[in-house]
Every structure is written in C-alpha cells, then in structure tokens.
Amino acid sequence: MQLQSRSTIRSSKIIGLIPARWQSSRFEGKPLKLINGKPMIERVYNQCSLVESLDKVIVLTDDDRIQEFCEENSIPYLRVDDDCETGTDRCAKAIESIEADFFVNIQGDEPVIDPGSIDFLIKNFLGNDSSANVFPSCLLYTSDAADDSLRVDL
C-alpha cells in the first residue's frame, strides 16, 4: 500500500488519543490536578481540540474519577481497564475498538502542547516517505492503514 500524500490527508480519519491514569509512583492523581483552576486533562484535551488534522480526541482511562470528570465535562473518553504499564500500551488496547485510519498518542501531561505542532507532525508524517518521527506526540496507526515498512508493532 502506498503512503498517503498531503492531498489525501483529509480523506483519512485521524483520532487523537490521550492516555490518563490516576496511579503514578511520582504524582498520583496528576490528570485532575488543577492548573490555574482547570484540571490538567481538560487543558490537554482543549489544546488537542484545536488540532485541525484530528477528527476526534478521546481520553483513555482506567479510573472512575477521570471517567466521571470526562462525563461531567462532555469530554469523549474510552474506558481501558486492561493492565497497561504505559500510555502507549493503553493506546494500543484502545485502537482495537476504535474505527480510524490513524491514531496520535498525545501525552496526558502536556497541558500547553502546541496544536500547530501536532498538525505539523501529522502532515509531515503522512506527506513524507519517512519511517519515524519523534515529537511530543507519537503517531500510531492501524496496520492496514499504512505501508508495512512503516508499521509500528506494539
């Protein structure tokens, strides 16, 4: 399968995934800690909602408190209760149940992430014949959506 060109990026369904867990050895409850009156996860979600290339942004969690916050604030979420050691593991589990061509794993503790940087990452990745991009976010995709030479096995 050929990589998609910049002209076909908009014909792809691209979903932003924000893994958010309560338990942490360094900072328990970090997603709901307030930053100038707003929880961190809300700030991350709001920034990601400004990314033009994303069709939807979904918070991934295994915690009742984070789920409740998302429900109360109309933030799309998916409950991923599997034993996931990392946010990337949580994303890998989630993409099994979400219909899309491409997924962007956006770190849940980047409340001031630049939406333009995520757009740049997506357009650069889909518009170039490159095997990897390192950025504040990591592009993930379903195996049938991209050339096998670029597939990331999780």
Language-model segments: which ranges?
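Hydrophobic alpha-helical segments, chiefly the membrane-spanning helices
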Residues: 153-154
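Conserved small/polar residues in nucleotide/adenosyl-binding loops
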Residues: 141-148
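Short beta-strand segments
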Residues: 19, 105-107, 139
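Short phosphate-binding loop-to-helix
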Residues: 58, 64-123
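Conserved donor-nucleotide/metal-binding helix-loop-beta segment in metal-dependent transferases, i.e.
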Residues: 116-139
